[in-house]
Amino acid sequence: METVTLTIDGRQVTVEKGKTVLQAAVDNGISVPYYCYHPGISIDGSCRVCIVKIEKMPKLQTSCSTTCAEGMVVSTRTQDVIEARAGVFEFLLVNHPLDCPVCDKGGECPLQDFSYQFGPEQSRMEFPRREFDGNGVRADVDFGPTLMLNRNRCILCTRCVRFMRDIDHDAQINIIDRGNGSQIATFQEEGVHSLLSGNLMDVCPVGAITTRDYRFKSRPWDNPFAADTICTQCAKGCNVTAWIKAKPEWAKGSRLIRFTPRFNPDVNDYWMCDIGRFEYHWIEGEDRIVKPLVKTGDVQQPASWRDATAGVSERLGAAGTSNPDGIRFLLSAHASHEELFLFKRLTQELLGDSGPGAITVTWRHREKPQPAETTFKVPAVDAPNVNGARMLGLAPGAPGAEQREADVSALRQAVEAGRVTALYVFDPGPEGSIGDVRWIVDARKSGALGLLVVQGVLMTDLARAADFVLPGASYVEKEASYTNQTGRLQGTSRAIPLPGEAREDWQILVNLGAALGVPFTYQSADEVRADIVGQFSTVTELQGLTTLAFNKPLEARSWLQASNPSERWKWDFMYQDLPPVKGNVDPTALPLPPGAIPLKQV
């Protein structure tokens, strides 16, 4: 790798040849503000706040568009740089409304932070601000099915324009009009229609583009915990951060407040799709199963775990004794390695060597409407662990839709013909992720299927038809491992506690195995993973299971550090220490408005 050495503010730094001055500064912890630059999209150089002084160059240069050269001497804090930068900030704030108290970006807004650190102390402008669609939150207009737009806040950094052009490859956003009337817009105000639209909120450095899902929901300082995990909504396995809101147990509403992308150049870069970002409300929704249910007659009744486990083991054991070939397992590819492995062991102990043949792994397959040139592709497979099932010998052959359809079709024919006396369904994903299973419900109604056990998270029509319902964990409530579409081994983190009496799925299976006489001795999921590595020592991709790191929910060190989550690599070091308050004003010496009561000084 070729490198160049340059000096920035008296520090010698060595960087890869071809990097810009701004990238060199950021990589070495030197604070340089910027708005229009984003590491995941093309360089524009339009905001001008990253200007620096470079020796032997007659004028100040934009550091985001200036390539590093050997021996270059750069200054970021000379007096002329400070004054020019403050002037740029003053112009950026000329028409920017003081909406911080009602703006969703407040508290994690680069415009707030950089203006405080680098901008002027006061404005010299006294004329009315330019307004496009009204003022305050009344200026918010529809910007598509997932977004809201406030043009008054826009600083025309063009990040959104370049994202749609460079990443989505569908230039739905453009700058229209000229001069003071310039604004971002879509064709005939149709708004943005894209599977990647939520990323526009991440790239927007101000509160111009916000999402309907997070709008007015919470403030960054009310989200004190964040867990780095992965998304399991499809086979891509995007690295994401789950944000948890501070909420007492008795308060209504969700603890899980939003998902944002986490940078990983090998998986999802800086982005995530709208499915993973917005379709998470089922996790804490009203349809969550929070207690074991046992059907008595035609009515499902809450039961203890002891009674439910004993009932399942008794009925499964009886079915295995009378007709071992009549026991089948239908597992969603949302199941983790640990869960798939335990099911495989369970069937081997119950049914012998032919046991794994009783397992059918299924998932939903749906094509996503995206331009062919899109850089960020969303897979058609709506499950995170099809590859993992194949490695464990439960989904032979290539993980394609044809194989899945053939396996499910064979199981369906057996169920409808009455050859299946007991069916155990494991569905830890969102509703529909296991595919179309209405045929199971129909088989129950017709009497073709005798025993149905459902282990899952949602009270679906399938769960309502079951004799036993065992409440499990969603992907943000357990530490579990998955292999994505490229063969990369990753893990989810436990971000929030389990609801009600729900349990982690490996615990349910270990307890069920014990009730059936299966010699499970696992005390933790770590022990399950170690056993997988031991029994599949020839499968190279699974050998990392014992060293896989699972992240714990971390306290947000500061909401400034979490600002603009898609760029957290920058904020983590840029705001180690907050700058001192400007000015030397004694708040107790300020005159009080008529009728105001002074605060008691302690």
Language model region names:
Residues 4, 9-70, 79-84:
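N-terminal cofactor/phosphate-binding cores enriched in small/glycine residues
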Residues 9, 55, 414-416, 490:
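Short strand-coil-strand connectors
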Residues 19-23, 336, 504:
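Short, structural beta-strand-to-alpha-helix junction motif
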Residues 48-232, 236-240, 245:
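Fe-S ferredoxin-like electron-transfer domains
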Residues 98-137, 497-561:
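N-terminal leader/propeptide and maturation segments of large enzyme subunits in energy/redox metabolism
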